[in-house]
Amino acid sequence: MSNQHIEELNDQQIVRREKMMALAEQGIDPFGKRFDRTANSAELKEKYADKTKEELHELNETAIVAGRLMTKRGKGKVGFAHLQDREGQIQLYVRKDSVGEDNYEIFKKADLGDFIGVEGEVMRTDMGELSIKATKLTHLSKSLRPLPEKFHGLTDIETIYRKRHLDLISNRESFDRFVTRSKMISEIRRYLDGLDFLEVETPVLHNEAGGAAARPFVTHHNAQNIDMVLRIATELHLKRLIVGGMERVYEIGRIFRNEGMDATHNPEFTSIEVYQAYADYLDIMNLTEGIIQHAAKAVKGDGPIDYQGTEIRINEPFKRVHMVDAIKEVTGVDFWPEMTVEEAIALAKEKQVPLEKHFTSVGHIINAFFEEFVEETLVQPTFVFGHPVEVSPLAKKNPEDTRFTDRFELFIMTKEYANAFTELNDPIDQLSRFEAQAQAKELGDDEATGIDYDFVEALEYGMPPTGGLGIGIDRLCMLLTNTTTIRDVLLFPTMKP
């Protein structure tokens, strides 16, 4: 530790370092060693929930707990404290005549934030709070910095996101939200594993961005002297596994898109993609509904859920509507009759729909109408299907109307939660779509993809009819934790330095 760093320490930090050195002089490792505990705070509260003070005294049972010291009060020969572990807090009752002079000195000199282990009798105070009456204290780790003021929770947003460790210590609501996230992902895995899907891993570094309409992050591989991109989707590699005969696969992993940031977008996020051979988009629609309803039930229980004051009937069958019908219902404009691109553009101008240079087909205009007018109306879980071919380069054409694809998106509270389709398995058609995307890219569409010749070659070996799905894990977690910003469900969101 440099002298410069010591000079920057405040008074509290200096005192804590002095206490650290005093512990070492007493032969106590300031940063401790392994410690065996017999219970956590939640287990004790559950086990003894119905026991009175007198009944606990009669039982005379002991427990060994460990955690971070969050409060401490008292004077003379008696003190109280609260110890925090992963499940919550438990009160400590510490008497000098019960723990001995040396142990009581450890307690007296302990700072808030220190980790200690405590062995003692399970009791209930006169106020009715379940507590541990300590008989032995063990110092486990020294905190050299004071915790956030009064531990009532951080309120500075920058600190919450940059120093998530402090947020987790001081904000139980935040801590529980991330526990819910982990449980949600585990339940999705459990659901798919139960349907005989295999979890796999595919590369994060790609030679060509593909599988989604998004701008990639570019990096350089020094050893091979080639530029590479971080994946914007896992789709193309997973479909190569379907070609290889794996039949049912999924991957939960990080995706990287070099795009804007807002309440629902972070450049680095988590998605799940699922592929099932011999299935179509209708099968995947049912699968999607099952995944989301299973996850919701596991973390929220049966029934509808509340999201920002709106009751979401996530437990009921999801609505299903064709994109063209949804547009007609909201705007009165009917795109079912055949029309020229000029006629479609005229309709767009009439309705003041923003137009982009790469909107060169009726399909682009239909999609623009949907995004402009319909998305904001989709509050209850709704599957919108039948996207135009032009905006669905990896989806199979609908055999009854080849202007559209066998694709759907799931919308809840006006946001997209899933994207899925009957996968395009015709390599000739796939190459043609890739070429159209490459042309759109030249016209200024930054989200258009290039041509992945390796994937086209894989398709030429034959891929069975397949349904595929992508779900945004972070958005789903936002929904199930009643959160309005993606940063609150990412442990470490992207921040400026």
UniProtKB/Swiss-Prot annotation:
Main localization, broad class: cytoplasm
Can you name this protein? Lysine--tRNA ligase
Q: Which GO terms describe its biological process?
A: lysyl-tRNA aminoacylation
Known EC number(s)? 6.1.1.6
Q: Which amino acid positions bind Mg(2+) 2, per UniProt?
A: E416
Q: Which CDD domains match?
A: LysRS_core (cd00775), LysRS_N (cd04322)
Task: Show the catalytic activity.
Answer: tRNA(Lys) + L-lysine + ATP = L-lysyl-tRNA(Lys) + AMP + diphosphate
Q: Subunit arrangement?
A: Homodimer.
Note how many cofactor molecules are bound and how: Binds 3 Mg(2+) ions per subunit.
Q: Where in the cell is it found?
A: Cytoplasm
Supply the InterPro entries for this chain: Aa-tRNA-synt_II, aa-tRNA-synth_II, aa-tRNA-synth_II/BPL/LPL, Lys-tRNA-ligase_II, Lys-tRNA-ligase_II_N, Lys-tRNA-synth_II_C, NA-bd_OB-fold, NA-bd_OB_tRNA
Disulfide pairings:
none
Q: Which PROSITE patterns match?
A: AA_TRNA_LIGASE_II
What keywords would UniProt list here? Aminoacyl-tRNA synthetase, ATP-binding, Cytoplasm, Ligase, Magnesium, Metal-binding, Nucleotide-binding, Protein biosynthesis
Q: Binding positions for Mg(2+) 1?
A: E409, E416
Ribonucleoprotein: is it a keyword of this entry? no
* Family label: Belongs to the class-II aminoacyl-tRNA synthetase family.
Is Transcription there in the keyword field? no
One GO term describing the cellular component: cytosol
Catalytic class of the enzyme: ligase
